[in-house]
Amino acid sequence: MRILNVSLLVLTAFLVDFVECGRDFYKILGVSKNANANQIKKAYRKQAKELHPDRNPDDEMANEKFQDLSAAYEVLSDKEKRAMYDRHGEEGVAKMGGGGGGGHDPFSSFFGDFFGGGGGNGGDEGTPKGADVTIDLFVTLEEAYNGHFVEIKRKKAVYKQTSGTRQCNCRHEMRTEQMGQGRFQMFQVKVCDECPNVKLVQENKVLEVEVEVGADEGHTQIFHGEGEPHIEGDPGDLKFKIRIQKHPRFLISVTGIEIIELKVDELVELLLEGIRFERKGDDLYTNVTISLQDALNGFEMEILHLDGHMVKVQRDKVTWPGARLRKKDEGMPSMENNNKKGMLIVTFDVEFPKTELTDEQKAQIIEILQQQGIKPRAYNGL
């Protein structure tokens, strides 16, 4: 009997803890408990597109999942609410006065009016639409490699109902008027409906633009219904076109040398030591300058990549000027499949010594290289 009572107490305590814990927001979003803000945003955005009620109007289960998803994002995207949730669960967040209810729909900050009112997503063909707005969004190569979210604050012009009425839906109609016996005249008149009056106001809007992992130059992110308003129809779309900036130099680290962050204004003389990536499709290209000594004897070095990891480059044979080394899966991630990456292609330049050699050193080089049989020859190198 005592064993049974103890078991019931344990079970009751477990159920109480389970109820107090509430929903597992990390599980709902499909992220780990140490996920960063960008990972949380990306997870929400991916699921919200599929579960939004306007896309699943008759699916009650999808609607419930979307409510849970919105509640999870509302809490985990807020630092204070997330900290409270991590300590005391959903009940703790509710006690602090907000969040977790699922009533807030952050969907529009990622997509605009994605489904409602036509919004550029298949509205009535006869419905007039405001002009689309296209904005160039300049991002770094690091942001395109790793993925990024850019918060855009803007003022949006919208029409709001006000007092009075106005003429609307105006069109031309043909009328017939009898001029006399057997005589008629046809003429065109302008006919309008009476609609509630509206005025143009400015609203503050915050949009989250996702720079997807592996984003391509020219890729466009569309926010439906966030463009120019139309007094008798739907607003146009707001489009952000990705423009990838030329990559600045980054540092290399020969084994045993600590990587330092250079300040350009203080260390201008070291500019030639910097390396930058150039992107072509999903491949990355860079040039590395090595000494003649390393070109002949071999070398080992590391290149700092766009996400902070080091790429080891090693040669144990002669490296000639213009030689290329290809590193598989060290290029850009594919936008369609982030698990696939292009090549990193390293081209080597060789820096020759600037000091003059003594006669003895020249004789030693001749003896070592044994290239007496190779004569200078001219060719068209253009």
UniProtKB/Swiss-Prot annotation:
Give the UniProt record's GO annotations in the biological process aspect: protein folding; protein maturation
- Decide whether keyword Kinase is in the record: no
Q: Could you list the residue ranges that cross the membrane?
A: none
* Entry keywords, A to Z: Chaperone, Signal
- Which residue positions does the secretion signal occupy? 1-21
Alphabetical list of PROSITE patterns matching this protein:
DNAJ_1, DNAJ_2
Has keyword Chaperone? yes
Which CDD domains does the protein's record reference?
Answer: DnaJ, DnaJ_C
Gene3D superfamilies xrefs: DnaJ domain (1.10.287.110), Urease metallochaperone UreE, N-terminal domain (2.60.260.20)
Concerning SMART domains, the annotation shows:
DnaJ (SM00271)
Could you give a GO molecular-function term held by this entry?
A: misfolded protein binding
What is one GO cellular-component annotation here?
Answer: endoplasmic reticulum
Q: Where is each J domain found?
A: 24-89
Q: InterPro entries from the xrefs? A: DnaJ-B11-like, DnaJ_C, DnaJ_domain, DnaJ_domain_CS, HSP40/DnaJ_pept-bd, J_dom_sf
Write down a Pfam family by its short name: DnaJ_C
Q: Mind telling me which PANTHER family this protein's record contains?
A: DNAJ HOMOLOG SUBFAMILY B MEMBER 11
What protein is this chain from? DnaJ homolog dnj-20
Q: Which organism is it from?
A: Caenorhabditis briggsae
The major lineage groups are:
Eukaryota, Metazoa, Ecdysozoa, Nematoda, Chromadorea
